[in-house]
């Protein structure tokens, strides 16, 4: 599979995209299941961590620290962020807006810190569900994009892949080395969503 993807990338990214769709790989659409919550309590929780109008990177770290989660190494944080999606709006890595945080509370059916803690086991179980993990993986691409961008830089991609897929991909080191060599030669300068998504399916 690695050889196939390398061959496709060496030819043309368009061919990789054609392969992606020809094999009936379907993109998943997130369907939020909204649960009634005490929105006043949820807003109070947001206010506890917000800095200005958003929960910024430092405060996001504090939020997950209070949940007993290491934000730097535990990918369950991506699953929580995945559940904070607001329709037609792209989340920004390292911050949660009020709208996103409250949406996450509604989607998970929680309105306080204890409720969030109670969902950790569920989020970990979702990481073991292939379909949910795939949805989360695809979400991370947009999550990692800078505002207004439709691609991510190579350094970000090669940092995220081992974290997300290290336990699933036997050839991760070779893949990362290949991408880094391509980047050093200026043969690739960005990572597109199509290649990001295709890599997941080849890993499977």
What are these regions (language model features)?
Residues 1-121, 128-131, 152-155, 159-203:
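Short, amphipathic alpha-helical interaction segments embedded in low-complexity terminal/linker regions
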Residues 122-145:
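Conserved, structured regulatory domains from eukaryotic proteins
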Residues 147-149:
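Conserved active-site beta-strand-loop modules that form the wall/rim of enzyme catalytic pockets
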């Amino acid at each position: 599979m690695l050889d196939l993807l390398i061959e496709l990338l060496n030819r043309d990214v368009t061919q990789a995209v054609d392969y992606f769709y020809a094999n009936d790989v379907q993109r998943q659409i997130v369907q939020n299941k909204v649960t009634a919550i005490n929105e006043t309590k949820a807003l109070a929780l947001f206010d506890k961590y917000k800095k200005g109008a958003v929960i910024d990177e430092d405060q996001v770290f504090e939020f997950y620290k209070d949940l007993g989660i290491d934000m730097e190494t535990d990918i369950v944080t991506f699953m929580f962020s995945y559940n904070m999606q607001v329709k037609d709006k792209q989340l920004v890595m390292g911050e949660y807006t009020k709208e996103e945080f409250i949406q996450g509370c509604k989607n998970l059916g929680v309105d306080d810190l204890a409720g969030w803690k109670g969902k950790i086991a569920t989020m970990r179980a979702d990481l073991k569900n292939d379909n949910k993990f795939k949805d989360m993986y695809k979400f991370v691409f947009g999550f990692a994009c800078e505002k207004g961008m439709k691609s991510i830089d190579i350094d970000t991609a090669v940092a995220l892949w081992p974290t997300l897929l290290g336990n699933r991909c036997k050839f991760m080191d070779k893949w990362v080395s290949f991408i880094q060599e391509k980047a050093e030669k200026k043969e690739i300068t960005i990572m597109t969503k199509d290649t990001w998504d295709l890599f997941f399916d080849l890993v499977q």
